[in-house]
């Protein structure tokens, strides 16, 4: 009887208190706090531009926020790059990327661009032309292996877009030729026409754009990538180690590097002549890694136990 009375009194207290059980609904608990300071001003600019909108978040890479702060004009202070889709009655709208800068103490929209892709695949920052500040590379995805990319440069108060003509499955920004400026390495697999290739794009002053300076064929048996790592080779060259998945739950490793003597990409493990291919095929599940922490990536290889037939 005493226990029942205590339970009844506790229930009555909860019912009468300001923090009622009904106030603890999921929506209230998950509502984010209001932005303050610069973030509030940036949010205001987005709302003025978009009206009703939904943020879009990059799917891969180091930058996964819908609003990314980064210095893209070399003035020593960060600008904002944001992604959203406008909410429309039919639910159909392009992704918008908006560039926001603080001018004379006020955050303002500088430019906005639309893309019909389904997702923002990734965002990268790199000084690709040697002007001393970073360009913005945005990858766009339509849920296939053929991603597209656009490079944006913010200079003289204007944002200039440049769509790259090549699609990619994965990419890396690295100084492959050791000239102090990053190059863009792009590789792709196309299961429809059974093609695979890697290419290196480098800034050209003549065209004021990224141009393809070298291209090499890769293993057409690969259907998708399991791992993609840029790293150092034992000879000091820079390359990309790619673990690719083949049919039958098999995996192989491809290496593509920039050869400074030949001034082109090399793929030493691949040959169009099947008799000259170096086989690194193994059961899927184990990818390349720097096992001994010497700065050089090691490649796994499968071999039968001693006494077993190969």
What are these regions (language model features)?
Residues 19-310:
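Beta-propeller-forming repeat regions
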């Amino acid at each position: 009887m005493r226990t029942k009375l205590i339970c009844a009194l506790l229930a009555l207290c909860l019912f009468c208190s300001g923090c009622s059980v009904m106030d603890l609904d999921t929506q209230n608990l998950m509502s984010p706090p209001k932005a303050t300071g610069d973030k509030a001003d940036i949010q205001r600019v987005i709302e003025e531009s978009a009206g009703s909108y939904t943020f879009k978040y990059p799917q891969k890479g180091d930058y996964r926020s819908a609003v990314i702060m980064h210095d893209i004009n070399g003035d020593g202070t960060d600008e904002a790059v944001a992604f959203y889709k406008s909410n429309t009655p039919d639910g159909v709208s392009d992704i918008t990327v908006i560039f926001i800068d603080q001018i004379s103490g006020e955050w303002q929209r500088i430019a906005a661009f639309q893309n019909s892709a389904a997702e923002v695949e990734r965002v990268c920052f790199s000084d690709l032309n040697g002007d001393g500040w970073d360009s913005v590379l945005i990858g766009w995805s339509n849920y296939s292996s053929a991603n597209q990319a656009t490079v944006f440069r913010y200079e003289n108060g204007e944002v200039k877009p440049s769509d790259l003509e090549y699609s990619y499955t994965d990419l890396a920004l690295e100084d492959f030729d050791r000239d102090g400026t990053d190059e863009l390495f792009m590789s792709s697999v196309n299961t429809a026409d059974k093609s695979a290739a890697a290419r290196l794009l480098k800034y050209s002053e003549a065209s004021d754009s990224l141009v393809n300076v070298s291209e090499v064929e890769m293993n057409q048996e690969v259907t998708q990538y399991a791992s993609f790592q840029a790293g150092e080779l034992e000879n000091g060259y820079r390359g990309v180690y790619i673990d690719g998945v083949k049919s039958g739950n098999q995996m192989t490793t491809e290496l593509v590097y920039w050869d400074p003597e030949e001034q082109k990409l090399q793929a030493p493990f691949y040959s169009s002549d099947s008799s000259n291919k170096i086989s690194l095929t193994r059961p899927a599940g184990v990818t390349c890694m720097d096992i001994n922490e010497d700065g050089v990536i090691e490649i796994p290889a499968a071999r039968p136990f001693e006494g077993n037939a190969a």
